[in-house]
Amino acid sequence: MKQRDFSEILSEVRAKIAAACARSGRSVDDVQILAVTKTHGAEVVEEAWRAGLSVVGENKVQEAAWKKAASVSGPEWHLIGHLQSNKVRQALELFDCIHSVDSIKLADRLEFIADEIGASPRILLEVNVSGESSKSGMKPEEASEVVRHIVENCPRLTLEGLMTMAPFSENPEDSRPHFRRLRELRDTLEREIGVGLPVLSMGMSGDYCVAVEEGSTCVRLGTVLFGDRPKIKPVRAVSDGDCAQGALDSFSGAGPTVRILD
């Protein structure tokens, strides 16, 4: 079977987003596609850029480091995975926006390092609206305190909105109550605190149409755009700097020498 052209796939995705916007009385211009390139090579970043996608999402700081260095295009880079405190400095140097701020402690760490290096990062608060123990994110009832703290104590940080991940399900409709709850939480925070939180980062390949219907302004799409993620073992570059500067694709073997980590 002939491999489908990426632009054709993207057109179908955009058409589905447009239909979801029409069903919910929204403008398609209000929804951004974030291309999730985790475990794929740097070439998919270039492919997404050429097709008109201007935002790339990565789960891991280390992977973004070599991939961004290997990319010749200029998308925005967003961190969508959990951020450890010891990775904050590197994350601030790499990413334009961090979707996964989940505590006052992490916000304070970001503020401290951002002030040191002169950064002004955009951030989203990750909220675990489903209550799943396997999910990162603060509890919904903690969000008000965190928002107030950031507004009052973190002038370097630009808080743009909220992010969540719905539990996995084969039925996209199962995600709807979780997306609705995040939107309602956002509305409550805006009303009670008097702060604008325009961004709702919610919806992935299996449920993005439902997310758009419920108010998502940023859908995080990987598999639906690029196919299944490569079946790989974790690898680490052993070249100088350990971040594969100038590498083309550490995962496919087109980059520097790598060592398999068992």
Model-derived segments and their meaning:
Residues Q245-L248, S252:
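Short Gly/Ser/Thr- and charged-rich N-terminal loops/segments
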